[in-house]
Amino acid sequence: MPSFDIVSEVDAVELKNAVENTRREMDGRFDFRGVEYSVDFKDMVVILRSESDFQCRQMVDILRGQLAKRNVDAKAMEVDDKIVHTGKTFAQNVKFKQGIEQDVAKKLIKLIKDSKVKVQAQIQGDSIRVTGKKRDDLQAIMQLARTSELGQPFQFNNFRD
């Protein structure tokens, strides 16, 4: 019986490359000349620091552009609304979601069941296993997951025939 797993993962290497490219682009930008800033990456969290909150927002936009160039889906990005002001600098955290959260998994399973395609879906930790009799049914579910607006990017792996 064919099956596959729906997962939501961000490639840490590509993310690190995007952070490095962001740092390089900011070194060359005229509006960041003479400005004290930093871009740090640790444990799937990017910390952006700058002298003004406007520059922090610009840094988020630059990071988004670099993620797009590296084929990392920006839906996995979770930007803190609050910019923290500490003395001389402003800081903003950007977290990246790994795995499918429980409530998103339940919504996706409900979406799969409402589609009336003859497949079974079950939650397995931070992924969803989808099993069906026909490969075409599984491909229809893949398309459904890609087009769903659940605020998280989905990848498919472990395809068994």
UniProtKB/Swiss-Prot annotation:
One GO molecular function term?
Answer: nucleotide binding
List the InterPro entries: DUF520, UPF0234-like_C, UPF0234_N, YajQ-like_sf
Q: Keywords in UniProt for this one?
A: Nucleotide-binding
Q: Which cysteine residues pair off into disulfide bonds?
A: none
Please give the GO cellular component terms listed in this UniProt entry.
Answer: cytosol
Tell me which domain of life the UniProt entry assigns to the organism this sequence originates from: Bacteria
- Which SUPFAM superfamilies does the entry link to? YajQ-like (SSF89963)
Report the sequence similarity comment from the record: Belongs to the YajQ family.
Q: What does this protein do?
A: Nucleotide-binding protein.
The protein's name: Nucleotide-binding protein Sama_2557
The species is Shewanella amazonensis (strain ATCC BAA-1098 / SB2B)
